[in-house]
């Protein structure tokens, strides 16, 4: 695509003016694409197939997208004046807009993770060694991919064969054995830190929404209590700002997914006070009233460890001023690697594989939707339309910071999708219809996600509802029970 570039300079973060280099935009887009297996991961007929046809190769597509970035930058006439060039952040925002608005959501998410990871390195929140690039380092993912391959559940077809062949019980047992072993290892690491002489006073269990933090926190606590440790647990949801202080968007939704939805300053003050042996007056939040309704005195006994289950537990301002040596961080995310067939891509001549990885966040969306319907009285469509806030929050201050973790756990299981599917299909299924989305034609994120998850649900062999209630098949302490019901573990947010 022939584009006349009208941008002469850009303003760097140190306010220096340097020449605008479109090739740099091509390189960063291509790098984000390459790190997730190429643009083919985002091929969507009817949305971006013409870009694939125009670009033909990954390099050509990156060039085409960079041209669109230039078109957007040219549209702001201020940038034509040498004293008012676009800033680095403005250019990054435009790159993200171009990727997202043309359906390249996986590349956009990867670009966002790179962007904020670099931000946290620049801020000194993490060293370069903790920069996790696209959020899923190969050395972390390869063992899980290998495990699924060994158990013939790394592909949709293989998983379906297991379900149809009546062999799911063995897969459930093996998967939970692996998960429990990872919890044993996490507990050993905590004890080892203490035996080494570290004065641990705080344990965080953090990770993206609906990853299984609550079940994991309970199970880890049980192990550590057997080792003689004592805990003080705080409900950090009590630190939400009052509802009136959360602005609404054009569909009357609120962004509760950003760390700044919490009173970070007060939380930090209280955590520091508790670690110093001081008593605090902790707020008690009434979700029914949408405000803080009371204060509760809390103090930490000298031998108690603060145990905190929070989405944003790694967000640096929360623990500002607290010695890292007293903190142990556990990161959990549902990351079950499952591959599906790649669709045909006419006119695209880039390297392409036969399969592509399903999205981890799509399984978490199903988990959250089911929880929201059953325990929060939220309609399924509202959860789908809200999910862009969830992704923005976790790509800013959760996934890019996972390198801070002392231990990384996988809350995703190969049997999750078969267990979740029966709640979303049929006459009583809660999955929104295409018609439900017609009133929101501008919500491309929701439209794309709906199409992708619908295809995934159609392709996976599900259990029956009766099978999902069978505790001999899926035990009551399995993570997925947080969402499908039948959990034998007390789940505060489900009460």
Where are these regions (language model features)?
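Long, C-terminal-biased catalytic regions of enzyme "large/alpha" subunits
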Residues: 1-135
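Charged, amphipathic alpha-helical linker segments immediately N-terminal to NTP-binding catalytic cores
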Residues: 135-185
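Conserved NTP phosphate-binding and transfer environment spanning the P-loop NTPase/kinase superfamily
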Residues: 194, 316-495
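Glycine-rich phosphate-binding loop used to anchor ATP phosphates in small-molecule kinases
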Residues: 195-197, 268-324, 379, 383-401
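Hydrophobic anchor at the beta1->P-loop junction of P-loop NTPases
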Residues: 203-205
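Conserved glycine(s) of the Walker
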Residues: 212
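Hydrophobic positions on the alpha1 helix immediately C-terminal to the Walker A/P-loop
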Residues: 215-220
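Conserved nucleotide-sensing/catalytic segment adjacent to the nucleotide-binding pocket
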Residues: 232-234, 241-290, 305
